[in-house]
């Protein structure tokens, strides 16, 4: 398995093993019952499969805050059966207060940090001709070399045209016992 994280605004934060990230998004999909289809699409499609557009940054923040609140009422035991045996044994998510919000606090915090960096860099560097800066959206990405360097080269149009699993998940292989 390999590690993945969030990248945005020139900041990369490695968060977890790919199977844990996959479980994070599956739990969001399964337990975000109070979200509208449009709100769920911001996280369940834009963040999971594509990237967070600048115009969606604030709405994505609000949706994630709602999900985090919802996760604060759900036990970490909801992860049972969602992680391969190896990840259950070595699971860093088990050292929490017992809620999904605590288990995935690193995920929520990393997304927020990358959103903040993307917005700060855009404000600071845009309009300065010597930089020719463009918004660097938040994406889920492989965080180990050389995967990170390869994934970093994927164009936004490739993300926009993506059909099927996200790029960060396409390299997952099943382990044989």
Predicted regions and their residues:
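Acidic (Asp/Glu-rich) sequence patches and key acidic residues
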Residues: 1-177
């Amino acid at each position: 398995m390999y590690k993945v994280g969030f990248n945005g605004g020139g900041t990369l934060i490695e968060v977890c093993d790919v199977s844990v990230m996959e479980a994070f998004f599956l739990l969001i999909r399964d337990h975000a019952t109070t979200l509208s289809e449009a709100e769920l699409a911001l996280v369940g499609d834009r963040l999971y499969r594509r990237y967070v557009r600048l115009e969606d940054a604030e709405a994505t923040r609000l949706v994630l805050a709602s999900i985090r609140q919802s996760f604060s009422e759900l036990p970490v035991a909801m992860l049972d059966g969602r992680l391969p045996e190896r990840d259950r044994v070595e699971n860093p998510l088990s050292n929490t207060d017992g809620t999904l919000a605590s288990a995935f606090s690193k995920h929520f915090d990393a997304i927020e940090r990358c959103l903040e960096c993307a917005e700060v860099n855009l404000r600071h560097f845009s309009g300065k001709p010597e930089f020719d800066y463009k918004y660097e959206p938040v994406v889920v990405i492989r965080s180990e070399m050389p995967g990170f360097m390869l994934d970093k080269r994927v164009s936004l149009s490739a993300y926009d045209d993506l059909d099927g699993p996200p790029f960060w998940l396409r390299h997952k292989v099943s382990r044989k016992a």
